[in-house]
Amino acid sequence: LLITAMIGLRVPTARLPAERTTATADTAHSSSIGSRAMRAADVAAGAIADVDVAVAVLDRVTGDVVGNGQATGPMFSASLAKVVVAVDVLDRRRSDALPLSASDVELIRRALGPSDDSAMNDLWTRFDGMGAVGRVATRLGLTDTAAPIEPDIWGWMTTTASDATRLLAYVAEMPPPDADVIIGALAQAPPVAADGFAQDFGLQAPGIRDVTAAKQGWMRWRTDTAYLHSAGFVGADRRFVVAVLGRHTFPDPDWQTLRRSVTMAATAAVGVLRGRIGSPGAGQLAVPNVHLPGVVAHLH
């Protein structure tokens, strides 16, 4: 998603976490596995200067969400917006009898796995993407998720790491036919996206085990700010949801620094969670990550 900024449009920036249900590094219980994973990710990300990394971990067994100091700070969503639209369309098919053809479902799969922007453009236009953001945010209690200020640019939807974990946790609880569409597409995401961008970073980085499905996102704002996000499920039972949202502001683009920071945070979090994840069971996804060598190509 190539972004050309509108003059005078305010860019979302990190802010101190508001009072809400997400526990921060200072308030999370020290024995919580999610808290330990979040802290490890925060420390790993902090090893690289000048990169803002928001980290949140949700435990679907306890319902706890823990995040670092930036976990409730809004950032541009980039392609994480595709999950929101997919949830809305499938929910409306089930609750409102929204007509949905097999080709429409294939659009959802293409928008999620290969992260095909043309498929998302069709979904956004035909199925009221702007309204989808509000409907899903209200239904799921995503209080820090908002529709884009420019209606035609879905990547300008704003969200947070904490809200991203809640969104994916909801996906895991959807009826199997709907959950399978979303999670199945994410689990089969290729290492190189439809636009040629290498998706093998964060939770999809080579060598990271036990990530069953993840959505990646990337975009560039003006000439000096890049966003790189990775959010997904850890464990065959999908007990944990991890979201790592990264932002790097720089005079000259340095995508490798941002990729390294997001990947280090994701690797650290998964490493801590590995001891608590379930083994594959009947009907559960256990898709290994398969990656091809690649470098950053363009912006998404």
Label the model's feature ranges.
Residues 93-143, 160:
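Conserved catalytic neighborhood of penicillin-recognizing serine enzymes
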Residues 67-86, 104, 122-123, 154:
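Hydrophobic alpha-helical segments that drive targeting, anchoring, or assembly
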Residues 12-54, 58-60, 125-300:
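Penicillin-recognizing serine hydrolase domain
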Residues 1-8:
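Hydrophobic membrane-insertion alpha-helices, especially the h-region
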Residues 67-71, 105, 114-119, 148-152, ...:
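Flexible glycine/proline-enriched surface loops and loop-helix/loop-strand junctions
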Residues 63-70, 212:
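Amphipathic coiled-coil signal-relay and dimerization helices
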Residues 80-83, 113, 117, 158-165:
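Short alpha-helical patches at coil-to-helix transitions and adjacent helical residues
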Residues 63, 74-98, 111, 242:
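Active-site SXXK
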